[in-house]
Design a protein with these regions (language model features):
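Short, hydrophobic/proline-enriched secondary-structure or compact coil segments at domain edges
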Residues: 500-502, 590-594, 682-690
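Short, hydrophobic/aromatic-enriched beta-strand segments in well-ordered soluble domains
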Residues: 548-550, 601-621, 645-656
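Bacterial Sec-dependent N-terminal signal peptides
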Residues: 1-23
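Aromatic-lined, polymer-binding surfaces characteristic
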Residues: 27, 32-42, 49-51, 56, ...
Length: 732
């Protein structure tokens, strides 16, 4: 009922109560009062001062050069592409400096550049480097960049509009902004109404233009879609792209990118129509969107690189500066302040001013990342992501991400039930991310490379199970979008963090279940490890490949292997064609251990094997004539001809290597025993033992996983009785 009431109220507000942009200037996210306060307070506030100086350096630099607005020619990374990007950023910083200092040299620069664009834009055809079957722009090869240009430029215009002569203002608004709004919202109708980050940027840019130009129609189309019926537009984006927990369906990399237009446009709505309560929408969804996004980072503050992600992006990015500032302003969440302080800058906005004041009143603290289960899907029923985190002896943490989320639309990868693992600063089990060199013109104009589809999206490029060398859902987004994995159970305690999920639709006749447990044993609470149990079940025989992607250098194995002297690809399709077979071995029945060194620490994977198990070491680079793929390695466990199989692996950090002292400690795996001691239709029991420690049993329920279910099982002379979906206990 709340949703219906909000929609009705919104319609009424837009048709009857929307403010005219002529009533008050500026109308977006930096008011005249806030600009005056920033000017007066920055000398005594280090965060405001550093933020002001950051923009001042950029603005002063552009004043040294003439305004240049080139005819669009280049793809991403090329001169004209980058120049148009710099131009909107330059205008934005110059407009900020004018608002704070009152120096008309800055406003004059913005006005001159906007006039230059007003002369150019009406004459532009679609971009000459546009890509077939991809929404094109005029200034840029893709329409997305056009919306980003408007997003920043309309903010700059908002701050200097009253300084520009009426005649020039009319030309800028008619020839440039209204022309561009028409192109983005009418000529690019499909993108404008798409539930996707491209659509988010488009509606945010057009909506803010509507506020600045005093055009209620623009605002309403932006918020409720072109037909003004609420089936598309900003509110629908909030409804469909985020789960109730604030998880964005395309994953954290694109959540980082999209959070800027979501938060800034929401702030513009709140400034112009506070009665709409946009920041209370869907139970404070935008607050959860920011806090969940921050949690989706590792200890290097990098976003977990699932789906189409450029690795190394951190929460120090410009998008998060704005998003965290606005989130603090609106929700007064003190947990955000350590991130803002660490960033060292605030946005020069109303929100940035409020946030800087709050930071100055608090002591320095570190950002607290916690174990958590994050639901996916607009109703929270499309699987999710589990973050398992435990402190370790080195004063950092062992972090695991277990992905059992939905497809993630076109940017999603086929990595159902995939995992990532980090140990402090070290990436232990990695994800390739996206095959793209963003804005590097030499690499296909900075676009996604063809290897993104042929390798990076494929299941074998992830830490998950692959059947018959075929990717999940045959690598088809349309098929993958029909179903999501099912969460079976989860339990977060001090000594164990455990999550189990099932995927029954990725293959026609293979059911997959993965249970991931991070365990800190009583005898060694500061040395957590990962117990990974991956079950494959089918009525027909298959080849099952469980892949572990590892950085670092192989140190030793417990099994013999043969190094290939002549390199060949692991297969012909679905990403296998890009993997060189570097070495292989047959370990026989028992357990196989592989140890590698990454940074200054050793890591081992110990896995149960039998006579049919084959082990492979692979490396990217096959059938890659242009060296588009980074050189990365994998350890692949293959089980051939099996209908059902249980992969049981224990992944442990151990020891250290000090190149300065030339010392090595505990380079060998501590695992002495790993066994599957019981298995039937209802239960599965694994035993494991570390050197000089007692053995433990992990019992899992395969059928009833209700937390109140009672279970009893006899294992040898030991009777196991427990309540819930699992039991972890000492072996007697």
């Amino acid at each position: 009922m709340q949703f219906v009431n909000f929609t009705v109220a919104l319609f009424t507000a837009f048709t009857m109560q929307a403010r005219s942009a002529q009533q008050e200037l500026p109308v977006l996210i930096l008011s005249a009062d806030a600009a005056r306060d920033i000017k007066s307070e920055k000398s005594t506030d280090a965060l405001l001062e550093s933020s002001f100086q950051y923009s001042r350096r950029k603005a002063d630099e552009v004043l040294k050069h003439p305004v240049t607005v080139p005819l669009p020619e280049d793809a991403g990374g090329g001169y004209t592409h980058e120049k148009h990007k710099r131009n909107y950023a330059d205008m934005y910083h110059a407009a900020l400096l004018f608002s704070i200092t009152g120096d008309k040299a800055y406003s004059g620069f913005v006005g001159e550049m906007l006039l230059a664009y007003a002369r150019l834009y009406p004459k532009l055809p679609l971009h000459p480097m546009r890509k077939e079957n991809h929404p094109a722009g005029k200034l840029f090869w893709q329409g997305l960049n056009e919306a980003v240009w408007l997003f920043y430029s309309i903010q700059a215009y908002d701050l200097v509009k009253h300084e520009i002569r009426r005649k020039d203002r009319d030309r800028i608004e008619k020839e440039l902004f209204r022309n561009m709004v028409r192109f983005i919202s009418v000529d690019s109708y499909e993108t404008f109404n798409k539930i996707h980050n491209h659509g988010t940027w488009a509606v945010a840019a057009v909506g803010m233009a509507g506020y600045v130009l005093g055009d209620k129609d623009m605002v309403e189309r932006a918020v409720r879609g072109s037909e003004k019926d609420g089936k598309t537009g900003f509110l629908k984006q909030l409804d469909e792209l985020f789960s109730p927990d604030g998880y964005y369906s395309e994953g954290p990399y694109y959540q980082r990118y999209a959070i800027l237009p979501f938060m800034v446009f929401a702030e513009a709505i709140a400034q112009n129509q506070p009665e709409l309560g946009i920041f209370e929408y869907r139970d404070n969804l935008l607050h959860k969107a920011v806090t969940t996004l921050l949690q989706l980072t590792n200890q290097n503050n990098e976003f977990y690189p699932i789906n189409d992600a450029i690795k190394d992006k951190t929460y120090f990015s410009e998008e998060l500066i704005f998003a965290t500032n606005i989130a603090y302003e609106r929700y007064k969440d003190a947990d955000l302040l350590p991130v803002i302080r660490q960033t060292g800058r605030v946005s020069l906005t109303n929100a940035g001013l409020i946030t800087a004041r709050a930071v100055s009143r608090t002591e320095g603290e570190t950002y607290n990342r916690i174990p958590m289960l994050i639901k996916d899907g607009s109703r929270g029923d499309q699987g999710g992501v589990a973050l398992l985190r435990m402190p370790n002896a080195s004063g950092t943490r062992l972090d695991a991400l277990f992905k059992f989320a939905s497809q993630g639309m076109g940017h999603g990868h086929f990595d159902r039930l995939g995992i990532l693992l980090y140990d402090g600063d070290n990436e232990v089990l990695s994800d390739y991310g996206a095959a793209r060199f963003l804005n590097v013109e030499a690499k296909d104009g900075g676009r996604y490379l063809k290897e993104n589809k042929s390798y990076a999206k494929q299941s074998i490029a992830h830490n998950t199970l692959v059947a018959d060398e075929t990717s999940h859902y045959q690598g088809k987004v349309s098929e993958g979008s029909k179903n999501a994995p099912e969460l079976l159970f989860s339990d977060f305690r001090e000594d164990i963090l455990i999550v189990s999920a099932r995927e029954n639709n990725a293959y026609k006749d293979v059911n997959m279940t993965r249970t991931v447990a991070m365990i800190a044993m009583e005898e060694a609470p500061d040395y957590p490890f990962l117990l990974d149990i991956f079950e494959a079940d089918s009525d027909t025989p298959h080849q099952y490949d469980l892949n572990f992607r590892y950085p670092g250098q192989l140190m030793q194995t417990s099994f013999p292997y043969q190094r290939d002297q002549t390199l060949s690809a692991m297969g012909k399709n679905n990403g296998y064609q890009h993997l060189f077979k570097m070495a292989s071995g047959k370990p026989g029945k028992g357990q196989a251990t592989f140890t590698w060194l990454e940074g200054k620490k050793f890591y081992s994977i110990t896995t149960l094997t039998d006579e049919d198990t084959e082990l492979f070491f692979t490396q990217t680079g096959a059938h890659d004539p242009h060296f588009n793929l980074r050189t990365e390695k994998s350890y692949l466990i293959r089980q051939s001809g099996a209908k059902t199989h249980v992969f049981v692996s224990l992944i442990e950090p151990h020891g250290s290597f000090d190149p300065q002292l030339e010392t090595v400690q505990n380079p060998d795996s501590e695992v002495e025993e790993l066994r599957l001691v019981f298995e039937d239709e209802d239960y599965l029991v694994v035993s494991f033992r570390f050197r000089n420690r007692p053995a433990y049993l992990m019992a899992l329920c395969r059928g009833e996983t209700d937390e109140d279910g009672l279970h009893k099982l006899q294992i040898g002379e030991q009777t196991l009785s427990w309540k819930g979906a699992y039991l972890l206990t000492r072996k007697q």
